[in-house]
């Protein structure tokens, strides 16, 4: 856990610059961010967001809220996915060739 800017792309870049090897990025609305240096695993617990943006999101955690899986089952699947990504499986952003979602000047405080 690091103190980074609130802008999605800038916060991911800050985490990676600080040494993060895999960014686990939680999103409610489905920000399709990625990075060229380290994988960005995007997860949501919003089932509407996952349904709409499943091509851009890597993990659907909404089953914790709506079932039928238990917290333990979801946690086990999440950890298997993290291990698979660490072993080379591409996250959605990498598979889509989506690396950074900022074009032009970004003012970050």
Residue ranges of predicted features:
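Non-transmembrane, aqueous-exposed alpha-helical and coiled segments at domain scale
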Residues: 1-8, 14-17, 54-57, 72-80, ...
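Hydrophobic alpha-helical bundle architecture
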Residues: 1-51, 63-67
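Extended hydrophobic packing segments that form well-structured cores
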Residues: 19-21, 26, 40, 61, ...
């Amino acid at each position: 856990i690091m103190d980074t800017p609130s802008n999605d792309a800038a916060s991911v870049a800050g985490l990676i610059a600080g040494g993060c090897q895999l960014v686990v990025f939680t999103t409610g609305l489905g920000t399709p961010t990625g990075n060229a240096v380290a994988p960005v695993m995007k997860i949501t617990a919003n089932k509407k967001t996952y349904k709409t943006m499943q091509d851009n999101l890597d993990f659907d955690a909404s089953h914790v809220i709506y079932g039928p899986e238990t917290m333990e089952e979801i946690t086990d699947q999440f950890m298997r996915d993290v291990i698979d990504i660490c072993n080379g499986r591409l996250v959605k952003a990498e598979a889509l060739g989506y690396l950074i979602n900022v074009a032009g000047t970004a003012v970050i405080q």
